[in-house]
UniProtKB/Swiss-Prot annotation:
It comes from Frankia casuarinae (strain DSM 45818 / CECT 9043 / HFP020203 / CcI3). It is an enzyme of class 3 (hydrolase). The gene is obg. GO terms for biological process: ribosome biogenesis. This is GTPase Obg. Its cofactor is Mg(2+). Mg(2+) binds at S173, T193. GO terms for cellular component: cytoplasm.
Amino acid sequence: MPTFVDRVVLHATAGDGGHGCASIHREKFKPLGGPDGGDGGRGGDVRLVVDPSVTTLLDFHFHPHQRASRGRPGQGSNRHGADGADLVLPVPDGTVVLTEDGEQIIDLVGPGSAFVLARGGRGGRGNAALASARRKAPGFAELGEPGEQLDAVLELKTVADVALVGFPSAGKSSLVSVLSAAKPKIADYPFTTLVPNLGVAQAGDRPPYTVADVPGLIPGASEGRGLGLEFLRHIERCSVIVHVLDCATLEPGRDPMTDLDVIEAELAAYSADLSDRPRLVVLNKIDVPDAAELAELVAPELRARDLAVFAVSTATRRGVHALSLALADLVAQHRAAAPARAATRIVLRPRAVNEPDFTVRPLGDGFLITGSKPERWVRQTDFTNDEAIGFLADRLARLGVEKELARLGATAGAEVTIGEVTFDWEPTLSGGGLGNGGLGVDDHPGGDGLAETGPGGRGPAGTAASGAAPSPGRGGDTGSSVSLGPRGTDDRLRASVRLTRAERMARRAAAVVDPAVRGEPAGRGEEEG
């Protein structure tokens, strides 16, 4: 079972928004209580937060699917649903978030830095929020918007001050163990170290610094040979690079200078940014016979390259203290020159400047409508409710969708796709008639431009349908005007019907008691915008 994981694929799902509620207030002696359906709660976000106590992505290796809680639905009596709890995922310092194609999204460095990986869906508005002067008691509510889903690649680039690089069995793990209190696995065979080992070193009264032992590099590591490609990224953030050269190994074609040139070539091939990092050279294992003489032989040539050289024995700890002091000074210089990083909370939701509300383009024999507003409106519409469909049609008409379809030559019956929903378009005779009626009320047969609308266009029973016979008026009483016939036509029939106050109250009461609005949650929702 792995104990160190530095790359995982995370499947994050934010919480859905809670559904809005369609409810009518019921109280003794209040026959016209009005709508009182509450809004649904917002879904929880999925957030990544840097936690200094976390050093690996192991938890996500075993649990790659993470889901936040959804918002609670609204209820009657204007009770709003509770928001879903955010899902906070602790990640190590230095975690990079990538798309599946390898494009970097964000680089999280610094304790407390946070990133909203998936945003929760908006809660749906209840019918109390949807009421207007023309729509006194809406018989529908909005649906909760689904939470975002994202598959992201998390990569850990260790945040270490000093990186030890070198060939396998050069003594890097042994050097970490004497510089710090870390206890890495040490053995006398190549590739003993399979994961980076981190240690915290303290040199005298200098500030502490971190040391990372990178698994052994071999020629071709930057191209994927050996283990180098998997762990070369852990060198990217280091302040100082330390070449650990083995002075005791006698192999054909290998010597300290050759090893140095090979490792430098691999670092340059991996990233040009590493060329400006300060470097030190450690000539290791000088306690072995003949190793000290070899170290003295190559030291002048290394110094000629402007490299600081330290002859070290991890077995006897000779030269270790001087090396630690030099590393502490270099790290302190780098920290003083680097700008301080502050913990940040990042939410990336870029939007183009002057982005249109919607676009219409041909799609086969039909048309495809894209845009954040129409797509969101479709997601939050309850297509089992005729009144909700009429409300959607009015919103699209006011946005200018019908006029744009007519301009592009759309004919009756053409398929119009918005998001995941496809409609059969039924244009009004004069075009643009959708914007002339009441908000969310379809008082004409088929005149809302959407084939889903039910007979008569009105949703709940008890409301006047197209073609209904006007009630006889009573002279002298204050009345209200009822619009009959297809909306948006040139020969629209308007009949002014004089109704007594008692008759108007009776009609409103009939609409209020309609079975479609019994106070149960009827939809899901979000905020209009």
